Amino acid sequence: MLSEIEILLQKFSDNSLFQEYYFVGGTALAYYLNHRISYDIDFVKPERLNTPKLKELSILFQARYIPDPNASVFRINTGESLEEYKMSFNFDGIKVEFFYPNDPLKTAIVKRDREESRRIYPNIHILPLQTIAELKLLAFFERSKIRDLFDIYVLLEKEIIDTELIERYAALKREMLTFPEVIEAFCDDGSESLDFMPENLYYREFYDIPSEAREGYIKEKLTELFVKRAAQGRK
């Protein structure tokens, strides 16, 4: 993890509010795997957010609230406040998102595995690697971010997830497409970059690959790996 993120997590560790949340997302994955740079922090809670407490936290840390552009549409469509599901802040230049999954499956996964969480700082608990991987896989099917694509490749390569789980969630989220077809249709939305530091495990592999060529490279590698593993699983 970036040293700035470690410092911020240490600051958070003095606040008991974080006992209600679990560290997940790309940075939590990088904590386990050291596979790439991740620039933000995600905390999940398997119940609706306590927005007044989060606002108090932001004031305490002099953090800047990041409004969600979809908040008005969400309220019109659901009659609810998006802040009960997701709130984002800028803490010392680092984006920190607190969220309650608006998805029964994700909520069930967090509730299923939260007793297996591990304390990495006082009041800061990280969910198991397998749980974070499962949540990442679901996120991959819902958006088009190159970091997610890369993460799925790493998780499959390291056998943290398998083709059976991928196929199950592909059928759930992309009913009409096989996973190789999902990969082929993938197009990065350009909102994030895929970056590495020399100490990251995949730094050497990607060092000579230009940023604009990395998506195609990962898609090819992931497709080959998935097809190979799926064939092995059917034997």
Segments the model singles out, each with a brief description of its role:
Residues 1-235:
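Compositionally biased terminal segments of proteins
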